């Protein structure tokens, strides 16, 4: 195990899949295999050709492997803890697989359950169909068997009858042959005796032949007559069926024609209503347009007159003012007294007029009501005449009332018209201007509010409305699906009910058809039996008369009977085949006839209600004609009323215009006549007249507005009264028409039902009587002649009735089972639906719980990762300081000469070429060491590492820590280890720490990271390295206990050299460590910690030495302090640049993660994540602003950092 682990080394410092120490021997990844192959190549260069050094090299290699293995285990444990990423990944994959498998198992169980239910329903339906088919096939087989048995019995009986007939005919033939032989012998003997007897016998034989032919001809004529009668009966039956078919067709045609007439009349009525509406709308639009045009014309005339008057008033302003003031003063005094009197008279007149108008309207309404009640019993013409009389009276009253109002207004307004017109024009103009300004301001404000509302709607209300619309659309879709399902179920139930009714009616119709056919067949059999009885009597009479003719007649009769039986058999077989074919056609074409069942049922109802519809159509036609005439007359009346109103309005306008022009003319003449007298008196009373004029105008405006309001109110009341009157009249007409139509339809329907019931009762009574008579006749004849056949028929009928009852019971049972199965299927479907709904709800709850658990788990992981990362950074810092101290102690002896040489060169350059320093005393090596490490090489290496990490510059591998160790030991294998170590990368942060890292930043983390970094590494290194204190300050007599060869102590009896650490940067190692660390996204204080600026001086070994060594010369001390201050400033600048750069990287990664999260959330939008998305957007904006600021700072710091790096390089070159 040790060999396998020891053979592995670091390649690039990255372990992609780190494992615990227990699982390392079992898992060999490609990375470790590649790492394992590298030391083999490097070890080939390690070995020397000398054989005496092989053992030492081998021991050193094993030691290095043990140290590397130990550091690897420590790094894995510190980085990942007790649980490695591979095991965590495996556990996470197992959990995901278990979750996916659980969901899949639930979905599989639901799908299996649904599949089983579907298969069970299909199997049940197939079993039901198979059972139904099997039952039908069984009944069909039973019917076929019974038919075969009947055919066999009939054939057996036929063969027996044929055999009997053949035997009888053979016996008759034998008897006839014997008689013929006997007659031949006798005839021959007689011929021998006498020729006369021969001729006599021949004559007699011919006479018998003639009689036989005559009898046969008579029988043939009778048979011909019977056949013709039968053919006539069949033709009559066909004609009867054809006539019934024609009647049905005529009934359907009449029904269709009535329906078409109805539809046509309804369309005409609707068209007429539409035309009336259009005409009414056109009339209203015409009235409005006429009003608008008239108003515009009057306004234009008034505007023109006002402009003309204004032009005149511009020339005669003073004259008009003085005359107007005097006239207004006088007019106001007279008008005030006159208005007081007129107000009382107007109030009395208005009260009287209102009382009279109310009385007239009340009397008109009462008379109209009485006339309407009386007109219901009279004809329509009298109603129209009464209506015209009422309207003429109303027009007369209206004209009288209007003429009186006009006369009263003329009397009131004549004295004050000339003063009101000018003021009215001015006030109207001011009012128009104010209204227009208000309208403009209101419109501007509305536009501003509308713009704000549109912006608010687009920003806030539009997404909410879209979301509500989307939810409403989903709810509407679900409701539509449920509605379609309900409609389908209702349609299926209706189809089943209609099919059941149709099937019952078809069965009844089939039974009726079968009864009619059986009656026809029985009538035919009765006729055949009658003819047979008559013929049998005649044949018996002939047999009594002549036996020879009886034999021929019996033979012919038997032939006729055989033919009749064959015909009857063929007819019965044809009927049976036709019946079976119809049954099969009805059975196989039931699916096609199902869609036509409803139409057939409607046709049957239409045939029954044919007479009622005819009467209804006639009544409706007459009522439509009456309504049309009434509406035409009412429209003519309305047109006349409108024309009268238009004429009245035109006359009113013309009269007002004439009055206005007359008043203006009179006012002009009066003003021109009184100009001279008004000039003197108007100047003293200007102020008084103005005040009085304003008050008078205010009161006049109020009075005129009240009068206009009363006029408008009266006109509106009159219009409403007219509308109410017309509406009540139409409502009464419509109610009376509807009541009459309903009563007539109810009477017709009752009469039709009564007639149909009476016909049905008569038909049933006649059918019952015919059945009783027919059964009596059948009983009598069957009891007399065919008792055996009657018994067989009774038995067969009883069996058939029982079979039919059993078949009906079976059908009912099958229908009941089918109905129960359908109900069970629907209940099962409802249960499955509820179970599926519960499953979906439980699944959503489970998903929500899992999401909450995942969020809590992610937060917990983030906290744990942050704490572990802080601990790791503190441990790595302590470990690196310890390792640096150990390597410096081990390399002190090997690099002591180089340090001395560098110090002497530095002294020469600092003191100048003229100054000479004292030669150093010879150093003797002893157990005591003055300073323990070559700080020049260590700090130079660290500075080189820092510059290498900041500017990606290549440095020789001997400047690293392991390189100095290898140089001290004299082993070249350490060079490769140092190169691998220097090129190693730090461990990556897990992926779960990258999510939403910027949202959890707080100042507490910064303080926590600084506190953990500022802790002494002694407390954390005791657990890692077994309590060995590696971070103690380097005192002169104390050395840390580290593995490795001990160096011999050196004594310095003379002047001690100044340490190189005094001129090197104190925190170069820290800078190198910071630069060597990878940039991890997240906040800088705990994601990527940096060394604090105020470090403890005991932590740096160089500072501890420099504090002990005091400078000899003052110039050297001043030079050292200036150089140290410069290097500290360079260090601070580089450190600040590095921190800003790492902060920029972390902010950029945080912004990228936030953008990715936003893209993912926008791909699957949810209503709960809207607030969270807004927070993330604001956070993203803050991070982007921070990125921009950091980028600007980096741009500003690039030039000073470049100068600092150039300065450090120059110092290194100078020291080397």
From Swiss-Prot:
One of its GO terms (cellular component) is centriole. InterPro entries: CACF_protein. It is found in: Cytoplasm, Cytoskeleton, Microtubule organizing center, Centrosome, Centriole. Keywords: Cytoplasm, Cytoskeleton, Repeat. HAT repeats lie at residues 114-146, 148-177, 246-278, 375-407, 1122-1154. GO terms for molecular function: phosphatase binding. Residues 87-106, 451-470, 617-636 are annotated as: Interaction with CETN2. Residues 940-967, 1003-1029, 1066-1085 are annotated as: Disordered. Plays a role in the dynamic structure of centrosome-associated contractile fibers via its interaction with CETN2. CETN2-binding regions contains a conserved Trp residue in their C-terminal ends, which seems critical for interaction with CETN2. Interacts with CETN2 (via C-terminus). Belongs to the SFI1 family. This is Protein SFI1 homolog. It comes from Mus musculus. The lineage of its organism: Eukaryota, Metazoa, Chordata, Craniata, Vertebrata.
